[in-house]
Amino acid sequence: ASMAIGAPAASACWYGDKSDVTILYTNDVHTYIDKQSPKLTYAAIADLKQSYQNAGKDVLLVDAGDHIQGTAYGSMDDGATIIELMNEAGYDLATPGNHEFDYGMARAKAVIQEADFPYVSCNWVDLRTGFNVLPSVKFFFVGGRKIAFVGVTTPETFTKSTPAYFMDKSQSRYIYDLSLIHISEPTRPLYI
């Protein structure tokens, strides 16, 4: 799985009056969209977010990965239904988990395009260009605060997904990487 880290920026970045910010998150949903116990459906998540908003609260809804694969709901259409549900639920941000790559690299990129919310990952790198495939960070200005989310896609994706999806098969070489060597000094790992 992957994670998104929310952290308030320094107090110098606060703007005007500050209020509490509620961060709702999902992780490792694995397409269990009709889970009855506890009743955690996308409709229930959307209702929870809306109830905070109706009460005048600042709220963000984020997902830390592994949402498009796991049951027949995902495999029937390679996760398209899940992205539609997440769009309807009002997600603000997501980061790809290792299972977002289970339907292939082209599908992983298509999922991101289908989403009405941005994806972030600081360590999904295109080795042909040396650049990140996605933005590393997303800033939100809510509740008088500047809040940053940094996406990290688990480096174990190569062993938990299909390594061939990260390769140029015609040249038998990797063209994508999920290690953190591209973003930090070797003595300062960002992922533990």
Where are these regions (language model features)?
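Acidic, metal/ion-coordinating pockets
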Residues: 12-184, 188
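Sec-dependent N-terminal signal peptides of Gram-positive bacterial secreted proteins and lipoproteins
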Residues: 1-8
